[in-house]
Curated annotation (Swiss-Prot):
It catalyses: L-arginine + H2O = urea + L-ornithine. It comes from Homo sapiens (Human). The lineage of its organism: Eukaryota, Metazoa, Chordata, Craniata, Vertebrata. GO terms for cellular component: cytoplasm; mitochondrial matrix; mitochondrion. Its EC number is 3.5.3.1. Pathway: Nitrogen metabolism; urea cycle; L-ornithine and urea from L-arginine: step 1/1. One of its GO terms (molecular function) is arginase activity. This is Arginase-2, mitochondrial. GO terms for biological process: adaptive immune response; arginine catabolic process to ornithine; innate immune response; negative regulation of activated CD8-positive, alpha-beta T cell apoptotic process; negative regulation of CD4-positive, alpha-beta T cell proliferation; negative regulation of chemokine (C-C motif) ligand 4 production; negative regulation of chemokine (C-C motif) ligand 5 production; negative regulation of defense response to bacterium. Belongs to the arginase family.
């Protein structure tokens, strides 16, 4: 029996169960945090995504929503560089510790958790919190960047380019103990993460991907294979042998900058709208999505109000597609169609209306 055949049957079973279930329980957490990098404005990402109509869109899909609001992270008054390079380590560590607690609580209460960033260093907290209740989770990381530098390989010092290194078990002897990071326990293995959309990878990151057998699909791979084949292979790798919760960590800069201009590290040659929506739709169709991060929307970097709105609207589309919106139209599932009333009944109703 082929793996492809088994996976096809698994997905058909999951899709059937999804169609039978019209309501997702979704917790929405705003994480207005920017200290994993140096550019201001990404802390306004959650507000921009909300203003673009996220809650209304999820409601229209039949989701049962719990809004945790926007978190207020504890400020760290004196946060010196680590090793004369790493920026805001104590702030990043503490914010992620606080975020992990909220994500953990939401997942334990039975919600699929949506975290609105904020910069991508927040994935340390979201994945750590998720893993407390779903230790066998797998990660689909959609991004222009691998975000797998260690504090010893980074050239920028920005922790939003390093979150995966703190989470990966295989890298722990390569990662120094940063102030504020003592609470973090590595919770994923190299076989439990797949990257999609890479096109700006630092040399040390490329070394890590190759030498630690981490699977990735660059934009060149997407051009060569097509997004359908990329998703088939992603699911073969992550859920082909067993069903397990999926954590989707989606950086808006995975898209081409013509679609998502309001972000801090845009890279030309990114995902098209159709490719991005296909990724989200296919993850929804597995029925295994358990948590989602949507990060790096920075309205302050837009050159116009239109650019800010376009980027936030795109973020809403990704999230909605992950919870059942389709390009044929997102609809609440009907058990049956209404039938016409009998002629007598219709006549009586007509008289009443008159």
């Amino acid at each position: 029996m082929s793996l492809r055949g088994s996976l096809s049957r698994l997905l058909q079973t999951r899709v059937h169960s999804i169609l039978k279930k019209s309501v997702h329980s979704v917790a929405v957490i705003g994480a207005p945090f920017s200290q994993g990098q140096k550019r201001k404005g990404v802390e306004h990402g959650p507000a921009a995504i909300r203003e673009a109509g996220l809650m209304k869109r999820l409601s229209s899909l039949g989701c049962h929503l719990k809004d945790f609001g926007d978190l207020s992270f504890t400020p760290v008054p004196k946060d010196d560089l680590y090793n004369n390079l790493i920026v805001n380590p104590r702030s990043v560590g503490l914010a992620n510790q606080e975020l992990a607690e909220v994500v953990s609580r939401a997942v334990s209460d039975g919600y699929s958790c949506v975290t609105l960033g904020g910069d991508h260093s927040l994935a340390i907290g979201t994945i750590s919190g998720h893993a407390r209740h779903c230790p066998d989770l797998c990660v689909v990381w959609v991004d222009a960047h691998a975000d797998i530098n260690t504090p010893l390989t980074t050239s920028s010092g920005n922790l939003h380019g390093q979150p995966v290194s703190f989470l990966l078990r295989e890298l722990q002897d390569k990662v120094p103990q940063l102030p504020g990071f003592s609470w973090i326990k590595p919770c994923i293995s190299s076989a439990s993460i797949v990257y999609i959309g890479l096109r700006d990878v630092d040399p040390p990151e490329h070394f890590i991907l190759k030498n630690y057998d981490i699977q990735y699909f660059s934009m060149r791979d997407i051009d060569r294979l097509g997004i359908q084949k990329v998703m088939e292979r992603t699911f073969d790798l992550l859920i082909g042998k067993r069903q397990r919760p999926i954590h989707l960590s989606f950086d808006i800069d995975a898209f081409d900058p013509t679609l998502a201009p309001a972000t801090g590290t845009p890279v030309v040659g990114g995902l098209t709208y159709r490719e991005g929506m296909y990724i989200a739709e296919e993850i929804h169709n597995t029925g295994l999505l358990s948590a989602l991060d949507l990060v790096e929307v920075n309205p302050q970097l837009a050159t116009s109000e239109e650019e800010a709105k376009t980027t936030a609207n795109l973020a809403v589309d990704v999230i909605a597609s992950s919870f059942g919106q389709t390009r044929e139209g997102g609809h609440i599932v009907y058990d049956q169609l209404p039938t016409p009333s009998s002629p007598d009944e219709s006549e009586n109703q007509a008289r009443v209306r008159i």
